[in-house]
Amino acid sequence: MRAEKQDAPVLSRWMKVLLGVSLAVLLAAAAVIGVAMHDRAAYPRVLEQICALDADAAERTLHGVIFFHDADEPDYARLTGLALQTGDDAYAVLSALEDEPFPAAFGDACAALEQGALDALMAQARAAYKAGDTDTALRDFELLCERDYDAACADWLLLARVRSGCTMSALAALYGETQDAVLARLTALLPFADCPAAILSNAGCAEAFLTGRWTSADGKSLTLTRSGAGYQMQTDLLDEAVPGRFFLRDGVYSVGADEASAQPLLRFEIVDAGTLRVTRVSDGRETTLTRS
């Protein structure tokens, strides 16, 4: 009878231990299940965040995965990396999306990222153009035109080609048009962006635009005509004739034996398709000319 009385407390203690262990196991299992649910939910959330173009949030979500990693995690990481890169090099992002396709389940996120990259590329292309980086601007605007981003891309591309030094004959070949048709394209752009300055930055385009007779209200005139392989300019805007060849660079008309030693005489500014503002370098006198 005494042994039986001693066994009951021992059994009770073991039951408590067993219950404690069971509870700990259940809590651990619940924690594991919670982590699993958290990890599994992270991947769809990454795609949602990329669709919203929130690359930083997508990166944080992906880094928050603890134990249960999706088989496609490398693709999630690659897509997130591209999203993070969009603000710095949208061209590379678009190239990667085209060259290395993602699984079909990533379709919506890829489409959103592509559109975001195109938007970023337009801004980057314009910034490159304004900074004088014509090589990058040409590359970016060409891709935007290939993707039919918007109608303005073709206008920006034409200006980038002019700024890059394309001759009128090269531009005509690129567009499959005559040089007169290319000039009409450029003239139709005025005053879009810096089109007036772009035309004057390219000697061939400037000469083509200035060709013809221009007159002022007080009877002054300037005439540019094609002469053989070059051009000839006649004007009474100067007090006296200066001997030598004429050169036209960045809107400045100079005359001399060669370009390095040529004397700057007139500075041109395109007001619109039929109006020029001409400034004499010697005294700053301005004259407005209209196309006759």
Give the positions of each predicted feature.
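N-terminal Sec-pathway targeting helices
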Residues: D7-L26
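Alpha-helical tetratricopeptide repeat
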Residues: D39-I50, A77, Q115-Y129, D155-W156
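Alpha-solenoid helical repeat scaffolds
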Residues: Y43, P74-R78, D108-A109, M122-A123, ...
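Alpha-helical repeat scaffolds
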Residues: A58-V65, D89-E100, T136-E142, T167-V182, ...
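Alpha-helical linker/edge segments of TPR/alpha-solenoid repeat scaffolds
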Residues: L82-L94, E114-K130, L158-A173, F192-A208
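N-terminal helix-cap/turn-to-beta initiation motif at the start of protein domains
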Residues: I199-T215, T225-G228
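Edge beta-strand at a domain terminus
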Residues: L200-A206, D218, V242-R245, R277-S292
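N-terminal glycine/threonine-rich, aromatic-flanked beta-hairpin/loop signature
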Residues: T215-A262
